[in-house]
Regions:
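Non-heme Fe(II)/2-oxoglutarate
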Residues: 45, 185, 190-295
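A structural signal for short, well-ordered beta-strand segments
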Residues: 97-99, 129-131, 201-205
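Active-site rim elements
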Residues: 68-73, 165-167, 188-190
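Non-heme Fe(II)-dependent double-stranded beta-helix
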Residues: 1-18, 24-119
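Catalytic core of non-heme Fe(II) oxygenases with the double-stranded beta-helix
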Residues: 108-172, 210-219
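Short, solvent-exposed loop/turn segments at secondary-structure junctions
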Residues: 28-29, 100-102, 117, 136-138, ...
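Conserved metal-binding segment of the jelly-roll/cupin
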Residues: 173-187
Length: 295
C-alpha cells in the first residue's frame, strides 16, 4: 500500500490475477467490537417496521452509515478509503450490504455462487468488502472461494453443483481482516462448527468514474511491461505480465491461456493502455483481424 493508502501497481495486478486481495487485521479492535453490536442490530431490525436500516441503493458512499455507526467508521478509515478509491474511485455508489451471521454449530451453508445474475462483456466491475470482526480459526467455516474464477462470466446459480474444486480456499484469519472481492469471484458461506457466533459484514460498491489509474501509480512505469513481452520469446522477469501469468490449480492449459487474455483485457481498461498484452495473444488476434478489415 502506498503512503496515501492507495494500492500499488503490484497489488492491483495481483487482484486482476486472483480476483481478491486480503488485508489482515486492518480494522482496530474497538471498531470490531462495536461492529458486532451494530451487525446484530441490523440483522434484527433490517426488515422490522422501525429500527436500524441499511442505506438506500445508489446512495453515495460518503453519505452512508453516519456517525456513530461502527460500519461507517470502518469504511472511513484512511486505509480502507485508499483501498476503495484504488478500485472504484473516491466516492462510489452503495449497492447493498448484508450481515452474515451463523450461530454456534450451525450446519447452514450456501451453494457456490457469484453475486450477479449475468454480466455484460465490458471490463467494469464492482467490489465487495468482506469484514470479519472477530477471529476465524481454520476449519471454523469462513467463506469458501475459488481464486482466479472472477472473469469466467457465469450465471449466478450455475455453480451450485460444484464442490471440492482444487485450489479453492476457505477464509480464516484474525479479527479485523477485510477481504476485497471482484464481484464475479465464486464463493459460498460455510457452516459454523465452532462454539461461538460467527459474524461477517459484506458491502458491495459500484464505480461512478472510469476505473482507470485510480491507484498509486508510482511503480507503474517500473512494472508495466511492453506488449512484446512474451514467455516464449523475450520477457521481463519482474513485471505485471509475470503476475498475470499466475496459474491456479483448477486451470487446464486452455483455461489458463484464456484467463491470461481476460486479465490482459482488464489490465488494458485499468491502465488505459489499449496495446497492453501478455504473451502476444491479443496482439496476434488483433493483427490478423486488421488484415481482414483492410481488404
Amino acid at each position: 500500500m502506498g503512503s496515501d493508502h492507495r494500492l500499488t501497481t503490484r497489488q492491483m495486478a495481483e487482484f486482476v490475477a486472483n480476483g481478491f486481495i486480503r488485508f489482515e487485521a486492518i480494522v482496530p479492535t474497538e471498531i470490531n467490537e462495536r461492529g458486532i453490536d451494530e451487525m446484530r442490530r441490523l440483522e434484527l431490525e433490517r426488515f422490522a417496521p422501525a429500527g436500524l436500516k441499511p442505506p438506500h441503493t445508489g446512495t453515495p458512499l460518503e453519505e452512508c452509515y453516519p456517525a456513530p455507526s461502527a460500519i461507517g467508521e470502518y469504511l472511513r478509515l484512511p486505509e480502507i478509503r485508499g483501498i476503495i478509491e484504488s478500485f472504484v474511485g473516491a466516492n462510489p455508489a452503495f449497492d447493498h450490504d448484508f450481515t452474515h451471521h451463523l450461530q454456534p454449530h450451525s450446519a447452514y451453508l450456501q451453494p457456490l455462487h457469484v453475486d450477479a445474475i449475468t454480466d455484460s462483456p465490458d471490463p467494469t466491475f464492482d467490489i465487495q468488502l468482506f469484514w470479519y470482526p472477530h477471529d476465524v480459526a481454520p476449519g471454523e467455516g469462513g467463506t469458501r472461494f475459488v481464486p482466479g474464477s472472477h472473469l469466467r462470466r457465469v450465471r449466478s446459480s450455475g455453480l451450485d453443483r460444484y464442490q471440492h474444486i482444487i485450489g479453492e480456499q476457505q477464509f480464516s484469519g484474525p479479527a479485523g481482516t477485510v477481504v476485497v472481492f471482484h464481484h464475479g469471484l465464486w464463493h459460498a458461506g460455510q457452516p459454523n462448527p465452532g462454539d461461538g457466533d460467527r459474524w461477517m459484514h459484506k458491502v458491495r460498491l459500484n464505480p461512478t468514474v472510469p476505473q482507470v489509474r485510480l491507484w498509486n501509480t508510482d511503480d507503474l512505469v517500473e512494472l508495466h511491461n511492453p506488449p512484446s513481452d512474451h514467455i516464449f520469446a523475450r520477457m521481463l522477469p519482474d513485471s505485471v505480465a509475470q503476475v498475470l501469468r499466475t496459474m491456479h490449480p483448477w486451470m487446464s492449459i486452455t483455461d489458463y491461456r484464456n484467463e491470461q487474455v481476460q486479465r490482459a483485457r482488464l489490465w488494458r481498461y485499468l491502465t488505459g493502455d489499449d496495446t497492453y498484452d501478455v504473451d502476444h495473444y491479443l496482439t496476434r488476434l488483433e493483427g490478423r483481424a486488421a488484415l481482414v478489415g483492410s481488404r
